Structures are given as C-alpha cells and as structure tokens.
Amino acid sequence: MTKVEIHENVQEIFRDVFDEEDIVITDKTNAEDIEDWDSLAQVRLTVAIEKKFGIKFDFGELTALHNVGEMLELIEKKIAG
C-alpha cells in the first residue's frame, strides 16, 4: 500500500469518526486542529485504524505521536512489517 493510499484511508476514517465529510487532514494536523478530537475520539481513531490496516499499536507508540504525519509513518512501518 502506498503512502497516498494510506493517507486516503486514514482520511476516510477521520471523516467517519468525526462524522464530518469535508474534514481534510494533512501531515501537520493534530488534536488541537479538530474541535471534537478528545480522548474518546482518539480511541475510536486508533481502533478503526488498527482494524482497517490489520495492525496493532502499543501505548508507547501512540503517546509518542504528535501529528497525523507521524501516525501515517507509523502505519506505513507496521504494514511493511
């Protein structure tokens, strides 16, 4: 799966979780940029991403992330094995 495909899939997950069809994420997007991105939304995002890509995050990996770009890089690494 290419970086673009990963981004497109994560974009759709964000739209589903936040129930906002026009939401646009960039590598620099973080929790402060999306009004409803709270701890519950983070859990929903994490579960949806893990399910979509067939991967598992550990707590340390998640707490180290600062923005969507870092999340996309982590997903790419996990998919690659």
Where are the regions that the model predicts?
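Phosphopantetheine-dependent thiolation modules in NRPS/PKS and related acyl-activating systems
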Residues: 2-81
